[in-house]
Amino acid sequence: MKQTERPKKWQCVLTCWGTKYSSTDINKLITKIAENNHHVARFVVISDRVHKDLDPRAEPVGLPDIFNKPEFTTGGQCHAKLSMFQSGLLKADMPAIYIDLDTAILGPIEQAFDFRKDEKSIVMFQSAVLPFSAFARLLFRLTKGKRYARGNSSFVVFHPKYWTEIADKFLAIYEAGEFCKFRPTISDERYISWVAQDDMVALPNSFAVKFPTEYMQH
């Protein structure tokens, strides 16, 4: 596989809604990421509230009202995460790594950029038997999108300038009354994988982060 050059600068994206996580939790993760990664130039925290005592390295961004809905943020749903793909929410001047707040950092996560095929690649862990591959892409086309390889959205490598369609299409589906009726929208990671199937790349499970077991069993 041809790989792209690792970026000299990248942005780390975190999301937070509800009351489970505090500024302390966010700050600990920011510190750990900064300690282990030499090229992280920006931390963006997308949240439904203002966090007091937030690490000064963090740029707070409000969760857009259109994504701040109970059906996107409660009952185990994380569709609010898709807001990071909305046009203008993130600066499009550098690639990004999104990471869940309950992730333990075991090393330099910026190495994940090495797995990209090109700048448009979205890199995630596999979460299903069907791997991201030429076969999966063929199956996706032959079944008109009914069969596709899926990733785990606890860790996502992407470039904001290429993927505003993820948010745009999702909101169009929601406004058409097809949310959760259209099967790929039953979870944010299924939906990302469905939209970006042709550009999905898998991270090896040995990569230097650790998630709670339940996140890897979707």
Label each region the model flagged:
Residues 1-72, 89-92:
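N-terminal anchoring/stem segment of glycosyltransferases
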Residues 6, 116, 148-150:
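Extracellular/periplasmic catalytic domains that process cell-envelope and extracellular macromolecules
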Residues 8, 39, 81, 99, ...:
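Residues that flank catalytic or metal-binding motifs in active/ligand-binding sites
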Residues 39-48, 95-97, 123-124, 202-203:
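Short, hydrophobic beta-strand segments that form beta-sheet elements in well-ordered domains
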Residues 45-52, 107-108, 128, 207-208:
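Short, polar loop motifs at secondary-structure junctions
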Residues 60-62, 80-132:
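GT-A fold catalytic core of metal-dependent nucleotide-sugar glycosyltransferases
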Residues 71-73, 139-146:
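Short, P/G- and charge-enriched loop/turn segments at secondary-structure junctions
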Residues 148-218:
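Catalytic core and acceptor-binding pocket of nucleotide-sugar-dependent glycosyltransferases
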